Amino acid sequence: MITETAAEPTVPAVPAAEEATEARGREEPAWPWKDAPIRTLVQRIHQLQAERAQGFRRLEEWLAPVQGLRAWGRGLRVPTCRRGHRQYLRSGPDYDFARYRSTVHGVTQAFAAASREVLAVEAELGGPRRQPLLAGHVRSLQELEQTRLGTVALLQLMETPELAGQEDAVRMQQLKMKVIKTMEAISEVLQDLRFDAESAE
């Protein structure tokens, strides 16, 4: 499973998204890891994964205590993306949509920034570095994260009060299992990436 400890603090982060938006109209700065060793690129991928995990935790702060919560949190023992949505649904009947939208927007921007950087690492590994195996791992990681995000979003949608009565328990269980399997696959890809990167250097 992916945890916050997967990140190694030895690699500096890319300038924040706020700094990038302030620089509109100016030429975009050079990518800071252009000539970095492969090991550093792999460490950065792990840091980006930790940032994604943090984004999922922010979404968790907005989920409702619907009946499926116990099965989701305890029975399956999965890090969920539910707290954010829980807070939103608890704010009903006069839902605090503006705050929820703000949280989702912030998380979406963080995910988009992480995705852009992951794609840049993939291009660097697949192009100038001539490491197609490592680039393939990075691409797989990106695809798995897209699957995870889409599945979590669908789960959140299915748990809204308006749809809770129409909830299909079997479908919910399938989606929860899909999240688990996707997270396991992400962990495997990260391990393969680290192992193959050590062999490449």
UniProtKB/Swiss-Prot annotation:
Pfam families with a match to the protein in the record: DNA_repr_REX1B (PF14966)
Region (Disordered): 1-28
Biased composition (Low complexity): 1-18
InterPro entries: REX1-B
Protein name as annotated: Required for excision 1-B domain-containing protein
Name of encoding gene: REX1BD
